[in-house]
């Protein structure tokens, strides 16, 4: 590959890394072809881009982006997973493969919003509910006070009617 091709690859990867919400690095050494194919398919289903990229070129592409802090982890065979939408779903898929006892897939590090994540933090991210579940929970908690307020407002006229009915019944007895 000539210098111009390498420069074009670095430019393309720099643009991808600049757009990324999260980036994860892994060592894929010793993975079976079937397992690697399965990993790629699951990541594709989670809208995650997965590539094996030369470390020196990846280091150059990361310069000037939020993921510049990955440089110390660029040693040995390195695969990069780039998430543009939901970092939690990417972490879930990668953690699942990293936990597989038969596999050789090892997470190295990750970057989320410019912050470096170690393996335990990636596992913690993977344990979070998905984006859709978090949004549903947030909307439910935002809706609860309004629902309670409407319930109180609806109960006030009923309470007034019961009080007036009790007063009418008391006067009727006298």
Curated annotation (Swiss-Prot):
SUPFAM superfamilies assigned: Ribosomal protein L10-like
Keyword Chaperone: no
Signal sequence extent: none
Keyword Cytoplasm part of the UniProt annotation: no
Pfam families tied to this protein: Ribosomal_L10
Record keywords: Ribonucleoprotein, Ribosomal protein, RNA-binding, rRNA-binding
A single GO molecular function term of this UniProt record: large ribosomal subunit rRNA binding
NCBIfam families xrefs: PRK00099.1-1
Protein name listed in UniProt: Large ribosomal subunit protein uL10
Species whose genome carries this gene: Pelobacter propionicus (strain DSM 2379 / NBRC 103807 / OttBd1)
Lineage: Bacteria, Pseudomonadati, Thermodesulfobacteriota, Desulfuromonadia, Desulfuromonadales
């Amino acid at each position: 590959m000539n210098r111009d091709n390498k420069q074009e690859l670095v430019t393309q990867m720099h643009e991808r890394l600049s757009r990324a919400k999260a980036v994860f690095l892994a060592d894929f050494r010793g993975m079976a072809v079937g397992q690697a194919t399965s990993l790629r398919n699951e990541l594709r289903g989670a809208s995650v881009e997965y590539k094996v990229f030369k470390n020196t070129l990846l280091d150059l592409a990361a310069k000037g982006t939020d993921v510049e802090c990955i440089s110390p982890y660029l040693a040995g065979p390195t695969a990069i997973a780039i998430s543009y939408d939901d970092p939690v779903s990417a972490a879930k898929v990668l953690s699942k493969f990293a936990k597989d006892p038969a596999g050789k897939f090892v997470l190295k590090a990750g970057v989320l919003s410019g912050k470096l994540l170690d393996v335990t933090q990636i596992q913690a991210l993977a344990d979070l509910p998905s984006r859709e579940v978090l949004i549903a929970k947030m909307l439910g908690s935002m809706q609860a006070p309004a629902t309670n307020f409407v319930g109180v407002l609806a109960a006030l006229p009923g309470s007034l009617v019961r009080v007036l009915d009790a007063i009418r019944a008391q006067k009727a007895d006298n």
